[in-house]
Amino acid sequence: ERRAHVGDLIQLDGSHHDWFEGRGARCVLMAYIDDASSRVFARFYDHEGTIPAMDSFQRYVMQYGVPLALYADKHTTYQSPAEPTVEEQLAGTKPQSQFGRALSELGVELIAAHSPQAKGRVERLFNTMQDRLVKELRLAGIGTIEAANRFVEAWLPSYNRRFAVQPAQAADLHRPPPAGGDLNRILCLKTSRCLRRDWTVVHHRQLYQVRTHVRAAHVIVEDRVDGTMR
């Protein structure tokens, strides 16, 4: 049964497919479908992973707002395979992936799907897209991710007008995105690094100088979706 409100629950998944039929490399379509309305947001990436998930979700949020819940499978991008630490066991919490941690900071509930059948709406979407969208990309002669993303951005509004449905309730439960640059600080990879006595840290096998002298044993390094580091 569908949720009644737009923004209440969004299904997310990645479809690995030969989207360009040999005109370019195989890639992944990261797709979001609203459970109440079947409205679709989608974007192509070269792989399904944390940075593509964060980048696509950030773009979704900037267009529609922050949903209440996200439904995803047990891919390690979404669900951490790690065993709980002693501290987590004592606190009654579970390990989180970087993406799961970001959703928690945004107040989004991450719901795990235990089978493809549980993600019926997004699975049916991919069946449709692997037919309809592949044909559209073929007609346009598209063979790169960059060109495909420009095409999909222009094509999806007409697709949604045709196939989205009216939700049972009119209220949209999406919330505004965080003000300022907070979204960039949340949807990023956060890693704790040991702060040396000379105020340097080692990250990705590189030595970095911390400009502001702080009294701490560790600092948090942020790898952002745009490739910058803070």
Per-range role (PLM):
Residues 38-43, 111:
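Short small-residue beta-strand/loop micro-motif enriched in glycine and branched aliphatics
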Residues 1-40, 48-58, 62-68, 101-105, ...:
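Mobile-element integrase/transposase regions
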Residues 30-31, 42, 219, 229:
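Generic short beta-strand
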Residues 24, 74, 204-205:
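Residue-level detection of beta-strand-connecting loop/turn positions
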Residues 13, 136-151:
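Short, charged, surface-exposed loops that flank catalytic or proteolytic processing sites
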Residues 153-230:
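C-terminal, beta-rich DNA-binding module of retroviral/retroelements integrases
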Residues 70-74, 78, 85-132, 148:
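RNase H-like two-metal-ion nuclease catalytic core shared by retroviral integrases
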Residues 1-18, 86-94, 172-183:
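Basic, flexible linker segments flanking DNA-binding modules
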